[in-house]
C-alpha cells in the first residue's frame, strides 16, 4: 500500500458537485492499494499515521499527533499512486490493485483508522472526485509499506 499524507488546515471532496466529506485541521490521505496488500499493511499504516507527530507544539517543534490536536482525516482512494511511467508518455496502472480487492482494502483501512479513535471522512472509491485542500506547511509524507519492510 502507498499513502501520501498531507497536513492541511482544511480540505473537502465533492462528487457530482455535492460535498461528500470535509475536515478542518488534519490530514488528507491519498491511498493506493496493490494486489498482495494485506491487513499487516493496513495495521502498519494506521499505527504510523495515528502516532505521527507533525503538528507544532507551543515551542514551534513538530511534536504533536493528530489526536493531540483533535484533527481529522480526509481519505481519498488513489490508484494512480501505482503509475508506471518507465515506457512512453502514457502511464500504466497495472501495478494497482484490482478494483474489487482494492475497494475492500480501502474500506478496511478507513475502518481501522476509525477503530483507532480517529475521525475519518472519505471520498468514494472509483468516483470522479474534486478534492480541495489548503496545505499547512506544507508537510507531505509518503508511506510505502513495501519499502518499509
UniProtKB/Swiss-Prot annotation:
This is D-aminoacyl-tRNA deacylase. Keywords: Cytoplasm, Hydrolase, RNA-binding, tRNA-binding. It is an enzyme of class 3 (hydrolase). It comes from Leuconostoc mesenteroides subsp. mesenteroides (strain ATCC 8293 / DSM 20343 / BCRC 11652 / CCM 1803 / JCM 6124 / NCDO 523 / NBRC 100496 / NCIMB 8023 / NCTC 12954 / NRRL B-1118 / 37Y). Its main location: cytoplasm. An aminoacyl-tRNA editing enzyme that deacylates mischarged D-aminoacyl-tRNAs. Also deacylates mischarged glycyl-tRNA(Ala), protecting cells against glycine mischarging by AlaRS. Acts via tRNA-based rather than protein-based catalysis; rejects L-amino acids rather than detecting D-amino acids in the active site. By recycling D-aminoacyl-tRNA to D-amino acids and free tRNA molecules, this enzyme counteracts the toxicity associated with the formation of D-aminoacyl-tRNA entities in vivo and helps enforce protein L-homochirality. GO terms for cellular component: cytoplasm. SUPFAM superfamilies: DTD-like. Belongs to the DTD family.
Amino acid at each position: 500500500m502507498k499513502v501520501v499524507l498531507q497536513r492541511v488546515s482544511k480540505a473537502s471532496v465533492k462528487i457530482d458537485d455535492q460535498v461528500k466529506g470535509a475536515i478542518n485541521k488534519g490530514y488528507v490521505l491519498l491511498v493506493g492499494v496493490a494486489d498482495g496488500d494485506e491487513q499487516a499493511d493496513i495495521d502498519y499504516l494506521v499505527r504510523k499515521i495515528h502516532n505521527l507527530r507533525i503538528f507544532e507544539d507551543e515551542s514551534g517543534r513538530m511534536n504533536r499527533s493528530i489526536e493531540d490536536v483533535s484533527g481529522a482525516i480526509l481519505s481519498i482512494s488513489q490508484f494512480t499512486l501505482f503509475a508506471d511511467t518507465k515506457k512512453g508518455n502514457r502511464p500504466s496502472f497495472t501495478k494497482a490493485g484490482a478494483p474489487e480487492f482494492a475497494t475492500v482494502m480501502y474500506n478496511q483501512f478507513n475502518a481501522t483508522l476509525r477503530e483507532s479513535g480517529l475521525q475519518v471522512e472519505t471520498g468514494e472509491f472509483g468516483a470522479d472526485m474534486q478534492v480541495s485542500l489548503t496545505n499547512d506547511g506544507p508537510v507531505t509524507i509518503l508511506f510505502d509499506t513495501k519499502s518499509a519492510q
